């Protein structure tokens, strides 16, 4: 497991000090972005980390302020998991973010539609 963010502990919005973790297990990679938005994504990209991930936990519940095109191009996820409550008052996930996720070609799972999402990696490295 590698901590890739936050880069800076100074931000106008606490979402942009979220812990961002990259986990690699048996050849499969996962990126957990907390509530990170585009500001933090840009800092992480500038730091030069390898961000490729088979599974991306979408930043900030799929907010339009997160998961920018440039960030998603680096991550190249096969699966996107959006942790979001049904009927939330913030109208998340955002329609722009959903469009960006669809543009990656990734399979999208939403907890408001699917409930809990479980990803497993077996001994052969199959996700």
Region spans (language model):
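Cap/insert and terminal regions of metallo-dependent hydrolase folds
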Residues: 43-116
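Core dinuclear metal-dependent hydrolase active-site scaffold
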Residues: 1-55, 113-127
């Amino acid at each position: 497991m590698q901590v890739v963010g936050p880069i800076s502990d100074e931000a106008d919005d606490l979402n942009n000090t979220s812990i961002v973790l990259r986990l690699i297990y048996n050849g499969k990679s996962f990126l957990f972005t907390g509530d990170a938005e585009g500001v933090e994504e840009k800092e992480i990209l500038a730091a030069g980390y390898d961000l490729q991930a088979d599974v991306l936990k979408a930043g900030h519940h799929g907010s339009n302020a997160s998961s920018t095109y440039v960030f998603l191009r680096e991550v190249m996820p096969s699966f996107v998991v959006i942790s979001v409550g049904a009927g939330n008052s913030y109208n998340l996930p955002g329609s722009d973010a959903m469009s960006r996720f669809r543009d990656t070609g990734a399979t999208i799972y939403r907890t408001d539609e699917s409930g809990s999402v479980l990803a497993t990696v077996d001994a052969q490295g199959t996700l």
